[in-house]
Amino acid sequence: MGLPWYRVHTVVLNDPGRLLSVHIMHTALVSGWAGSMALYELAVFDPSDPVLDPMWRQGMFVIPFMTRLGITNSWGGWSITGGTITNPGIWSYEGVAGAHIVFSGLCFLAAIWHWVYWDLEIFCDERTGKPSLDLPKIFGIHLFLSGVACFGFGAFHVTGLYGPGIWVSDPYGLTGKVQPVNPAWGAEGFDPFVPGGIASHHIAAGTLGILAGLFHLSVRPPQRLYKGLRMGNIETVLSSSIAAVFFAAFVVAGTMWYGSATTPIELFGPTRYQWDQGYFQQEIYRRVGAGLAENLSLSEAWSKIPEKLAFYDYIGNNPAKGGLFRAGSMDNGDGIAVGWLGHPVFRDKEGHELFVRRMPTFFETFPVVLVDGDGIVRADVPFRRAESKYSVEQVGVTVEFYGGELNGVSYSDPATVKKYARRAQLGEIFELDRATLKSDGVFRSSPRGWFTFGHATFALLFFFGHIWHGARTLFRDVFAGIDPDLDAQVEFGAFQKLGDPTTRRQVV
């Protein structure tokens, strides 16, 4: 036929059977990719340390999505929360992956069947004997069915009425587990961090979808609207479908990057704003302060800080620290975290407690500056030693560790103090294994960053696709070159070839 590559999809333009076939094949490819990717991730995933080597540090992409929907166990005998299990049941990680691959195979066969048997009676308009689709009716059917699925997910799966519930955690990502969620029908349901809003919104949106679907099945569109929006043209369907997809992609890019109940930090890693705002640092200091108020020693108070909370307060877990073109997981960057060394407290020879100024997100290097509780600079690591006033050596800075592996250890030699001051710029200090994966020491992004980048990019591309196909379908007669002052009225669309002698004409 000699079509250029960008026009090959026109072969299914007036062929409903094969249009259906290629969409079933597309579903087969998507489902097959999901199942295969899940099996690959399970093959390389190490579940042994859910605290310091969680899924998001290992660059897992589909495992977090399965987990947030209630899958936590593996046929390998491990659970995502740690420990071993004996009876994972059919809906394990491997079970879900297998179901997607089986479904992919069935869709593949169905696509072939519909490609071969394309000329079905159901696609034939009995009035003309030609293939046609009742697009408004199909829209109603799809709206109704998606409404049923949406309502069912919110009312049964999320609430635990018939299903496991979803992943729910505390604001600091420490106690996450899969549990049923009650719908939140008040104003709190609009808080993006309230899990109950997921249930209530799916129930409400599903109900609306069911009612709207029934409406579109029972009410025909007015003729002017039908013609004005080109409802008989399949490219209108393409344009509006692309609009729905790019809108959804923009929304989920936002909920992923800024954080929400749908993107728990235990599954996708913390957000960059939690580092920018000192979110975990404040909670750690609050807990230490509460411990001191209970007459605990500084060492005891810091030892009660969960390693998981301390690990969140480390810049290497900030998704904005990885470059867009640095491939690989976070573990391939700064290494696999082995243990928390403890919290370093710096003091000068006058006894002032000093705090290392933390590195902002978008800096690769940052001056080492130590300030006291009033924000006054007391020490630094100078760029030009000849002009230094506040160097570690001059000020006599020492460091002592509280909690972690170095609990109670102190150092006074300047080289060691400066080493830990540099590391304290990056948040809490961890021992990192860079040998196992040959990690290069350059920070990587988490799946949160990759998901956001991918969906924001494709949303932008799909936005242009919506404009393109929307314009093509609305202004098809203009683009085809029909003269608006033509004496003979051409019924454009009955035949799409201009100048075709068989095109029906009606004299005005």
From Swiss-Prot:
GO CC term (a single one): chloroplast thylakoid membrane
Disulfide bond residue pairs: none
Main location: plastid
Protein location: Plastid, Chloroplast thylakoid membrane
Protein keywords: Chlorophyll, Chloroplast, Chromophore, Membrane, Photosynthesis, Photosystem II, Plastid, Thylakoid, Transmembrane, Transmembrane helix
Gene Ontology terms, MF aspect: chlorophyll binding; electron transporter, transferring electrons within the cyclic electron transport pathway of photosynthesis activity
Family matches, as Pfam families: PSII
InterPro entries attached to this UniProt entry: PS_antenna-like, PS_II_antenna-like_sf, PSII_PsbB
Entry's cofactor comment: Binds multiple chlorophylls. PSII binds additional chlorophylls, carotenoids and specific lipids.
Bilayer topology term: Multi-pass membrane protein
Keyword Cell inner membrane attached: no
Sequence intervals crossing the membrane: 21-36, 101-115, 140-156, 203-218, 237-252, 457-472
Biological processes annotated in GO: photosynthetic electron transport in photosystem II
SUPFAM superfamilies for the chain: Photosystem II antenna protein-like
UniProt family annotation: Belongs to the PsbB/PsbC family. PsbB subfamily.
Assembly description: PSII is composed of 1 copy each of membrane proteins PsbA, PsbB, PsbC, PsbD, PsbE, PsbF, PsbH, PsbI, PsbJ, PsbK, PsbL, PsbM, PsbT, PsbX, PsbY, PsbZ, Psb30/Ycf12, at least 3 peripheral proteins of the oxygen-evolving complex and a large number of cofactors. It forms dimeric complexes.
Function: One of the components of the core complex of photosystem II (PSII). It binds chlorophyll and helps catalyze the primary light-induced photochemical processes of PSII. PSII is a light-driven water:plastoquinone oxidoreductase, using light energy to abstract electrons from H(2)O, generating O(2) and a proton gradient subsequently used for ATP formation.
Stated name of the protein: Photosystem II CP47 reaction center protein
Gene that produces this protein: psbB
